[in-house]
UniProtKB/Swiss-Prot annotation:
Name of encoding gene: arnS
Disulfide bridge positions per record: none
Protein name according to UniProt: Serine/threonine-protein kinase ArnS
Induction: Induced during starvation conditions.
SUPFAM superfamilies: Protein kinase-like (PK-like)
GO molecular function terms attached to this record: ATP binding; protein serine kinase activity; protein serine/threonine kinase activity
Phylogenetic lineage: Archaea, Thermoproteota, Thermoprotei, Sulfolobales, Sulfolobaceae
Organism name: Sulfolobus acidocaldarius (strain ATCC 33909 / DSM 639 / JCM 8929 / NBRC 15157 / NCIMB 11770)
Length: 623
């Protein structure tokens, strides 16, 4: 009995320390009634009624619907229980517990009695979830702000008079769990319990604001399509599907090709990419287009005629004409959506390392596109390389090469190539020609410096790959003035031949390649910037003399022998070319500008380490 009295007195002192003096008398009366209930259990009824009334009076959040239902009854119920049991122990426990709950009420708390036993401050709102797997997270939008929470985590909002909330399903292990509420309004002092339950299917109809809906039209039945959403690719057949996401969705879809015997169906989306937000609808309409292939016999890749593509569509580009032929491919003028482009189709050769070259191109295509943004390089807009089609072509299926050739889409250069300018006798024989040549070589040297600093070797520098952005007509003086006053008019093209420094070389143009480049094709040695510097020197020599180098014949024979499959004889010709270079002294026109002569002599040397760098060439020509 004494211990009970001490406990009650201690509790009362704690309560008195936080109450005002006005309330002391009321509290003391409650304690007295509790003590009397220890001696006479019947007094428990009186004590219960008193404590209930006191709690209701002191609870600042009292309302008939909340306090009577949630807060008040516990005091009376426990105290009444002690009276019914008629035991002093239950009276002590009930009195202490009643006073503790009374203290919480006075401090501004509401007591919610249930299996969850929540106690919430009157100026707070609590959100909790039940029903999700332990590993799952959940989210709730409160006053337009998304809150991300762990499975067992509650959301407690303090000093919030009211909260407008919205709930969405949660996807766990490919299964949707839906909440029992969609939207609502909560007020301070409330506990909002959200119950999740699993459902079959995608519940986007009920929770429309939580999903982005994609609707696809125009495709044949059972035709799959691939859509990329936030970097993840999905292969689908459904014409209507929904994506659950809290964040914006960036989506992208490509055209679909269906091949027939002598034609190909192309289904092109009216919108290829976009950014959407949840609650939105994206409609993608595919338009059908049929390409009918020529029924003429398709030539073998060894005797390929690029003219077979003229008038046809390749990768959605209409081929207008063939504008260039080379040892490693064909260049065609193409059109798409009213704009002109150049398409280079790479040749496939059974006797060279074609697949390895295409592997490198596929791997480096994105980097080369970025590099081509330099104003002195012809821009690359895209590349199409499918190793399976190349293998089929090498195995004799030439239709694969006809329909899906390895191709690079490039900026179309209206002015043609530097090689075209050589045909103008009046220009070449004029006093302005050397200055035009100096200007061109300096710009290409700057382009090579840019590539070399970024770890790439071009490997195919020659007049045919030096382009003019605009057509230039007029007298030699006019041509020189236009070239010298128009930035970006002179560009180095065909970046598709470029590889990283040190990587294997699979191709070469003997007339412009140094001996060690052809040797590297045979032996597998890596590419070096000095190969480009030599090729630029040969280009300069060609522009000044209109002649090929004396020892080029050896390099041509070396490459021919390699193609025939006899590398040992090829190496003999390469060594003969190197010996000729040791004693080679370039014969230039007597009036050649000294700086141009220095570049020729400094680049056409047999030892790659002694050659001028592209940066050296720029300095010489700018000095």
């Amino acid at each position: 009995m004494l211990m009970s009295f001490i406990l009650l007195i201690s509790t009362s002192m704690i309560l008195i320390s936080v109450f005002s003096y006005v309330l002391i008398a009321l509290i003391v009366l409650g304690i007295v009634l509790s003590l009397i209930s220890l001696l006479s259990p019947r007094v428990s009824y009186v004590s219960s009624v008193y404590l209930i009334g006191l709690t209701v009076y002191l609870n600042p959040g009292f309302s008939l619907t909340q306090s009577l239902i949630n807060t008040v009854p516990i005091l009376g119920e426990i105290n009444m229980l002690s009276g019914l049991l008629k035991t002093p122990v239950t009276s002590i426990i009930s009195s202490l517990f009643s006073l503790a709950l009374l203290n919480l009420g006075i401090k501004g708390y509401e007591i919610y009695l249930s299996k969850h036993a929540d106690i919430v401050k009157l100026d707070s709102i609590i959100f909790s979830q039940h029903g999700l797997p332990k590993q799952a997270n959940w989210n709730i939008v409160v006053n337009s702000e998304v809150k991300l929470l762990k499975s067992n985590e509650k959301l407690i909002l303090s000093n919030t008079p009211e909260a407008k909330y919205e709930l969405c399903p949660t996807l766990v292990d490919h299964k949707y769990y839906v909440p029992n509420k969609v939207t609502g309004l909560a007020f301070e002092g409330e506990v909002i319990r959200i119950n999740y339950s699993p459902v079959d299917g995608v519940p986007y109809e009920k929770f429309r604001n939580c999903f982005t809906v994609f609707e696809v039209e125009g495709l044949p039945p059972d035709t799959s399509f691939v859509i990329e959403i936030n970097g993840a690719s999905l292969k689908l057949k459904d014409r209507k599907f929904a994506k659950l996401s809290l964040e914006p969705l960036y989506w992208k879809v490509n055209e679909i090709r269906i091949s027939r015997e002598d034609e190909e169906e192309i289904y092109e989306p009216d919108i290829k990419e976009g950014l959407t937000f949840r609650g939105g609808t994206v409609k993608i309409n595919f338009r059908r287009k049929v390409i009918r292939y020529k029924t003429a016999k398709i030539p073998s890749i060894e005797n390929w005629d690029p003219g077979i593509w003229v008038g046809q569509e390749v990768y959605g580009y209409r081929v207008i004409e063939v504008i260039g032929l080379g040892g490693n491919g064909y260049v065609m003028k193409v059109e798409k959506n009213g704009l002109l482009y150049a398409m280079k189709v790479l040749s496939v050769n059974k006797f060279t390392n074609s697949l390895e070259h295409f592997d490198n191109l596929l791997k480096e295509s994105e980097n080369l596109e970025k590099l081509s943004k330099d104003p002195r390089l012809v821009s690359i807009y895209g590349s199409f390389v499918d190793k399976n089609n190349i293998q089929s072509a090498l195995a004799g299926d030439y239709t694969s090469y006809y329909k899906y050739p390895p191709a690079i889409i490039m900026e179309f250069m209206e002015g043609g190539t530097l090689f075209d300018l050589i045909s103008r006798v009046d220009l070449v024989q004029s006093k302005y020609w050397q200055y035009i040549v100096k200007l061109v070589i300096k710009e290409i040297a700057k382009a090579l410096t840019f590539l070399h600093k970024r770890g790439y070797v071009h490997l195919d520098v020659k007049p045919q790959n030096i382009f003019l952005k605009e057509k230039i007509n007029g007298e030699p003086e006019v041509v020189y003035k236009i070239l010298s006053s128009t930035p970006g008019i002179i560009k180095l093209g065909d970046l598709g031949s470029a590889v990283r420094v040190g990587e294997k070389i699979t191709q070469a143009t003997p007339a412009y390649s140094p001996p060690e480049q052809i040797e590297a094709v045979i032996t597998g040695k890596g590419a070096q910037p000095s190969m480009d510097n030599y090729a630029l020197g040969v280009t300069l020599y060609k522009l000044l003399t209109m002649k090929n180098l004396d020892y080029v014949n050896y390099l041509d024979k070396a490459f021919d022998e390699y193609i025939k499959g006899d590398p040992s004889i090829a190496m003999k010709y390469i060594n003969m070319a190197k010996m000729s270079m040791v004693n080679f002294k370039p014969k230039l026109p007597h009036n050649t500008l000294p700086e141009l002569a220095n570049v020729v002599q400094g680049t056409l040397v047999v030892d790659p380490k002694r050659r001028l760098t592209s940066y050296d060439i720029v300095k010489i020509l700018e000095g």
